[in-house]
A protein has these predicted regions:
Chain A
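Transmembrane alpha-helical segments in multi-pass inner-membrane proteins
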Residues: 255, 261, 265-335
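Membrane-interfacial amphipathic/re-entrant helices at transmembrane-helix boundaries
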Residues: 2-75, 117-118, 122
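Helix-loop-helix "hairpin" substructures at the membrane interface of multi-pass membrane proteins
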Residues: 133, 199-276, 300-305, 371
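Cytosolic-side transmembrane-helix boundaries in multi-pass membrane proteins
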Residues: 1-28, 34-38, 234, 241-248, ...
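Hydrophobic core segments of alpha-helical transmembrane domains in multi-pass membrane transport
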Residues: 22-37, 75-80, 100-106, 127-131, ...
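Single transmembrane alpha-helix segments in multi-pass membrane proteins
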Residues: 35-40, 50, 55-110, 124-150, ...
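Transmembrane helix-bundle core of multi-pass membrane transporters
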Residues: 59, 153, 157-222, 275-276, ...
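Short loop segments and helix-boundary regions at transmembrane helix junctions
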Residues: 9-20, 83-92, 113-184, 219-224, ...
Length: 371, 317
């Protein structure tokens, strides 16, 4: 009889393991990506070297990496907040877009006359409201009718994208730039509504994103309300026994999750993009947020460094294209990272060991294995 | 709308609905085994690119279809491993598959010294059963003159329906999706059944993807399937996990996708409706149908497999 590996659930995983799993996930994804690169005739090491250089090799590279990371911190927070509560909000993409729509809308409505200390907070708040409103379209049916939110949030992504396209390509809405008639594009928001830049093109949005992530961590981890939320996430039945109003908690967290993605849209519009521009906003940043959250183990502070890593990857795409390697290499790597991170969950949840001694062998009838 | 435009819309809906039938029936089979695979979009794209590539190399359509099914099935094996063997979260694993598949398909279409992107297919599926019978009013163009894969999709839906509800293996499959512990007690190998049906689901998604690149739009482009893989996941619920209903649900969505082109041909005021708004129609339809079908007491009669998405721990029976 061979010695069988014993797989058993473990309680709390060590901090070392929690860091080891994401690191190994990234390395394993690089190996898989390297195989595909090698098959198609590229030298993986050259490609990865180029990516590293594009992301961190120069002041411009670092600045661009942090610009890309800014929205990912918040879409990562959006996914982590919801997933902690077993609310499967896959709609970060749509909530991000609606945040951008609301934020650019308020900036254009306020016009250049409003001072920055009014315009910038208004833009950010509007973004959060836009994201929360869009999340509510899925959250309210989920909480009051039991409608599966996976499908509704997914579908809402495509509706939001079409709506943004309608505002720019399909109508003469206030969002569309009237000065450009040949090819439709978004109307630039007033300079007073734009976030000040401080390092190359990097704006203060990165600090706002980090502050909001810390606030979310504090709210969930350090407050009485957050404790109740965590109880609901662990076991809805326990929460009900404890007198916690479960459906209200789920609704609020769902809306906060939407708001976080909406903030990301606002910071992206008021930061690097400067207009409601479908070509710059349809980048899958909401989906990448799910990768960020999963790789961070749904930890609201771990989201920050992981977002910077993913931002670096996103930022490397155009650099690859310039040397004739498809930019989709980045999406492929990100998908592979997520696959390995999910698989790694197994090792966080379970312990695998070899039995120390030969187990007492019991004669079993054919085909029946000892439990 | 006059009669001929109605017929044209319906014929176009059959074309646009066919890949959705394959993918939806595949996902129904997977979900009936209790495994939720949200990676349909990724599997379809892998099917689309590998099928196109294989036909591009050999000029052989059937070979392309087989390669598409094998490759998409291989991708679904990743999800089978994580969700059945490692028993991790199926939702995140499926999303990972969707992202990886999309990225890899786009990468393969653009990589190498002579990338596929922009090339027309070397062969494409042509209409069959044309001529006399296709000229019968109304019924003719709806039933005849389609490409062979349209008829294959009806066959697949019929076969899946028979398999699920009329065979012993189908019964075991449904038992595994409803109550794996009881199924195992009755002598069914739960993990094996789940693996097999995740792989079948992957193969059918790959076939659906190949329909885009070898029949519907036989040129390789970066984003050849739109949101078909995501819509297929919604269609599973609208079809209430029954293959035959998936056929009608898929055609309904095909028609919703087609309506923007139909309205263009009708002249004012219909042609004034912006296509960007009409593009929302299938997704709004899905949300409304979801809310109506799954809310309150109706949900119980819908027929969702009871163990869908729940990992099965043999040791903790």
């Amino acid at each position: 009889m061979t010695r069988r590996l014993i797989v058993e659930p473990r309680g709390l995983a060590s901090a070392r393991l929690r860091i080891l799993v994401p690191v190994l996930s990234v390395l394993a994804a690089l190996v898989v990506g390297g195989l595909f690169l090698a098959i198609t005739g590229e030298n993986p090491l050259d490609v990865y070297g180029k990516m590293l250089d594009a992301a961190f090799g120069s002041a411009n590279g670092v600045s661009n990496t942090l610009i890309s990371a800014t929205p990912l911190i918040l879409t990562g927070v959006a996914a982590a907040l919801a997933f902690k509560m077993l609310v499967w909000n896959i709609g970060g993409e749509g909530q991000f877009i609606m945040g951008a729509v609301f934020a650019s809308g308020i900036a254009i409505w306020l016009g250049p006359g409003a001072p920055s200390w009014v315009a910038i907070p208004a833009v950010i708040v509007a973004g959060g409201v836009g994201g929360a409103v869009w999340a509510s379209v899925a959250a309210v049916p989920r909480v009051y009718l039991g409608t599966n939110e996976i499908i509704t949030t997914l579908m809402l992504n495509f509706i939001a994208l079409s709506f943004m396209n309608f505002l720019i390509f399909g109508s003469s809405s206030p969002w569309r730039d009237p000065a450009v008639s040949t090819f439709p594009s978004g109307r630039p928001i007033p300079d007073t509504a734009k976030l000040p830049e401080f390092f190359k093109r990097l704006d203060i949005g990165i600090f706002i994103a980090i502050a909001l992530a810390v606030a979310a961590w504090w709210l969930i981890g350090k407050t009485r309300w957050g404790f109740a939320v965590r109880v609901v996430g662990d076991s809805a039945a326990t929460a009900r026994y404890a007198g916690i109003r479960v459906s209200k908690k789920i609704l609020v967290v769902f809306l906060l999750s939407g708001a976080a993605a909406g903030f990301a849209g606002a910071l992206y519009v008021a930061g690097p993009v400067g207009a409601l521009d479908p070509r710059s906003l349809d980048l899958g940043l909401g989906f990448t947020g799910i990768i960020v959250a999963a790789l961070a183990g749904l930890h609201l502070l771990a989201v920050i460094p992981i977002a910077i890593l993913m931002g670096a990857l996103n930022n490397a795409g155009p650099a690859l294209q310039s040397i004739g390697v498809p930019a989709a290499t980045v999406t492929m790597l990100q998908g592979a990272i997520l696959i390995f991170a999910v698989a790694g969950e197994f090792f966080i949840r379970h312990r695998i060991r070899l039995p120390r001694r030969e187990p007492v062998s019991v004669e079993m009838p054919d085909g029946v294995e000892p439990a | 709308m006059n009669e001929s435009q109605l017929i044209l819309t319906m014929v176009a809906a059959v074309g646009l609905g066919t890949p959705l039938i394959f993918a939806t029936v595949g996902e129904i089979i997977t979900e009936r085994a209790g495994i939720l695979n949200l990676g349909v979009q990724g599997m379809m794209l892998i099917g689309a690119v590998t099928g196109f590539w294989a036909t591009f190399q050999t000029g052989n359509l059937e070979f392309g279809v087989v390669i598409a099914m094998v490759c998409a099935s291989a991708l679904s094996a990743v999800h089978a491993f994580t969700s059945i063997t490692l028993r991790v979260n199926q939702i995140v694993s499926g999303l990972a598959l969707a992202l990886f598949g999309s990225g890899l398909a786009s990468f393969l279409g653009r990589a190498g010294s002579e990338p596929l992107v922009g090339h027309p297919s070397r062969a494409q599926f042509e209409p069959i059963l044309t001529g006399g019978i296709a000229d019968i009013p109304i019924v003719g163009p709806l039933l005849f003159g389609h490409d062979p894969l349209v008829y294959l999709s009806w066959l697949v839906a019929g076969a899946a329906s028979y398999y699920l509800f009329r065979t012993k293996m189908g019964l075991s499959l449904r038992a595994v999706g409803e109550d794996p512990a009881s199924a195992e007690a009755a002598g069914v190998h739960v993990s094996k059944v789940r693996y097999v049906h995740v792989l079948i689901g992957g193969a059918l998604a790959g076939l659906g993807g190949a329909y885009f690149s070898l029949a519907l739009t036989p040129t390789w482009q970066d984003d050849p399937i739109g949101a078909a893989g995501w819509i297929a996941i919604a269609l599973v619920i609208l079809a209430s996990w029954r293959p035959w209903r998936a056929v009608f649900a898929a055609y309904l969505f095909g028609a919703a996708e087609r309506i923007q082109f139909t309205l263009q041909t009708l002249g004012e005021p219909w042609s004034d409706i912006p296509s960007t708004l009409l593009a929302m129609l299938p997704f709004i339809l899905a949300i409304v149908a979801m809310i109506v079908l799954t809310s309150g007491k109706r949900a119980r009669f819908l027929g969702a497999p009871a163990a869908l998405g729940i990992p099965y721990f043999r040791e903790q029976r």
